[in-house]
Design a protein with these regions (language model features):
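Short, basic, low-complexity termini and linkers enriched in Ser/Thr/Gly/Pro
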Residues: 2-3
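Short, Lys/Arg-enriched N-terminal segments with co-localized hydrophobic residues
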Residues: 10-25
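Active-site-adjacent bridging/hinge elements
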Residues: 27, 66-69, 150-152
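Small-residue-enriched, tightly packed secondary-structure blocks
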Residues: 43, 47-101
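Amphipathic alpha-helical interface segments
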Residues: 50, 55-60, 94-97, 110-203
Length: 204
């Protein structure tokens, strides 16, 4: 940087101290709020909805994954390349939680034994599907829908207007909060909760 150059506040804070180190002494609630505010700022910097959430979480939470994994979020913006499917912010939240609580390999074992262990890991109590099922259910409870086209229907003819951008910024902030809460809460407790919509009648 040239002498005397000025940085935007959000860029200055990131260069003064490594982000994870800077937030290492925060309480869980402070980290959740920091993640939400970073996601919010990301939108004004030019990140799309999915990128905003994944970048904010993965910049604070040390997953051991390379920073390049953030690139995986790009195509999900606007409900997958503006297709209007699942909201990009919601997908970003799922990706962020997966980066921490997802599976990198199957359980040890062979044949039917391995398959049964895998099924239990997903469907059991605790089970990963119980944890991830909370993300879309919480998002829908907050916003009424999970599909981009339904959330943004009133702006289909004025997609790039300010009101639409402000609306999506709130979705992004909320989705980042959902992801952060699930990551920073007790995993087994979160993964033992009842299923929500779609499989709410699945036997315990």
């Amino acid at each position: 940087l040239a002498s005397g150059s000025k940085l935007l506040p959000e860029l200055r804070c990131c260069l003064e101290l490594p982000y994870i180190e800077r937030t290492s002494t925060m309480t869980a609630q402070e980290k959740i709020e920091e993640i939400k505010q970073r996601a919010r700022k990301n939108f004004s910097l030019g990140y799309n909805c999915a990128e905003c959430v994944t970048e904010s979480v993965l910049s604070l939470i040390d997953t051991g994954l390379p920073s390049e994994v953030k690139k995986l979020a790009t195509g999900f913006g606007g409900g997958i390349g503006l297709y209007g499917d699942t909201c990009g912010a919601l997908v970003g939240a799922v990706m962020a939680v997966s980066a921490v609580h997802g599976r990198s390999s199957l359980p040890e074992g062979e044949g039917k034994e391995a398959a049964m262990k895998s099924k239990e890991q997903l469907y059991g109590k605790p089970g990963l599907y119980r944890l991830f099922n909370q993300i879309p259910n919480r998002f829908k409870a907050q916003n009424g829908h999970t599909l981009c086209r339904e959330l943004t229907d009133k702006w289909q003819e004025t997609w790039l207007c300010r009101d639409h951008a402000l609306f999506c910024r709130e979705l992004i902030t909320g989705a980042a909060g959902i992801a952060a809460e699930l990551i920073l809460s007790d995993k087994d407790e979160s993964a033992s909760k009842p299923f929500g919509e779609n499989v709410e009648n699945l036997k315990e």
